[in-house]
């Protein structure tokens, strides 16, 4: 909880100065970005680009079940929806 609050403080403290100087740094060297944020649109992604938190583990089956022959024939008709479901061992009927 404290970590999220800290990042929001960083974003609020740096973004107005970046917008004010048109994201060209803090004015020391014209045309060179010294803050590492090329535009205000990319700024939140650089702050919140953390790796996956180690405390959050997805609940997935240990072995993906192979689809039955009947479900495999449906893969040709509807590949966009069934392909990702097969990875986790589900078919469209029981997902």
UniProtKB/Swiss-Prot annotation:
Keywords: Plasmid. This is Uncharacterized protein YuaS.
């Amino acid at each position: 909880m404290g970590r999220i609050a800290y990042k929001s403080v960083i974003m609020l403290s740096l973004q107005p100065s970046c917008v004010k100087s048109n994201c060209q740094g803090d004015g020391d060297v014209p045309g060179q970005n010294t803050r590492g944020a090329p535009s205000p649109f990319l700024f939140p992604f650089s702050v919140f680009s953390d790796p996956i938190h180690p405390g959050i583990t997805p609940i997935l089956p240990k072995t993906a079940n192979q689809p039955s022959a009947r479900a495999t024939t449906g893969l040709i008709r509807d590949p966009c929806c069934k392909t990702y479901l097969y990875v986790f061992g589900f078919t469209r009927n029981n997902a």
